[in-house]
Regions:
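Membrane-proximal helix-turn-helix segments that form the acceptor-binding/catalytic region
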Residues: 6, 30-46
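A conserved mid-protein helix/loop that constitutes part of the nucleotide-sugar donor-binding site
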Residues: 94, 98, 103-117, 135
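Short alpha-helical donor nucleotide-sugar binding micro-motif in glycosyltransferases
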Residues: 155-156, 163-168
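A short hydrophobic beta-strand element within the catalytic core of glycosyltransferases
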Residues: 171-172, 194-195
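Carbohydrate-associated surface elements
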Residues: 53, 72
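A short helix/loop element that forms part of the nucleotide-sugar donor recognition site in Leloir-type
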Residues: 78-90
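Nucleotide-activated donor-binding/catalytic signature segment of Leloir-type glycosyltransferases, i.e.
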Residues: 137-156
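Aromatic "clamp/platform" in nucleotide-sugar-dependent glycosyltransferases that forms part
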Residues: 176
Length: 195
């Protein structure tokens, strides 16, 4: 940040969220990330944020006006349940969908605990891969194995992903910390009810 500034270059910083709040960072890493945020607020020529909450945070915390540019998504064409029926036995409106990286701050453990307490014929589909949190991933696999209604697909893309979004009863993302989740926007673009 300082080197380009010393050379007279313009600096534009995009802030996706308040990463220092994430549980995965220890105290030192959180301090470093927070320090970087302060430097960006003070020295960047322009700061771009992806959510109104982060815009308000910068105004309140640093008295800094920032530019709000939300994530953009394409408007999809919904797909019928074909691959997901063949591979997982899923039907339209027959499942709740969680789609995200499987890391603690996404709150999947809360969702599984809550789902196991409700009586429903609907399934819970967990789609996503781990991101350096193998211990957590193993915990999630153990929790999911205790309920036959829970289906773990691992990472999905292409037609499988489109079918999962298109046919979900409800999309659920119980994150502890979130900037502007692209998966939430995608789920909304398919017309899903979102929690």
């Amino acid at each position: 940040l300082w080197m380009p500034k010393l050379l007279g270059r313009k600096i534009v910083v995009t802030v996706h969220g308040l990463d220092w709040q994430r549980a995965k960072w220890g105290n030192f890493a959180s301090f470093v990330i927070k320090f970087g945020e302060k430097m960006a607020a003070k020295y960047a020529d322009e700061v771009i944020v992806l959510s109104e909450n982060v815009r308000q945070y910068f105004a309140d915390t640093y008295q800094r006006q920032v530019t709000y540019i939300p994530n953009g998504i394409s408007r999809p064409v919904p797909k019928e349940a074909n691959l997901i029926t063949e591979k997982y036995g899923l039907v339209k409106d027959g499942y709740f969908l969680f789609l995200a990286r499987i890391v603690p701050e996404k709150g999947l453990h809360y969702l599984i605990e809550a789902f196991r307490q409700i009586e429903t014929d609907k399934k819970l589909v967990i789609a996503g891969g781990s991101s350096q949190a193998m211990e957590y991933m193993e915990k999630i696999h153990r929790m999911a194995a205790e309920d036959t209604r829970i289906i773990m697909t691992d990472f999905v893309q292409g037609q499988m992903l489109e079918e999962l979004y298109s046919n979900a009863y409800t999309f659920v993302l119980p994150s502890d910390v979130e900037g502007m989740a692209l998966t939430l926007l995608e789920a909304m673009s398919y017309g899903n009810c979102c929690l």
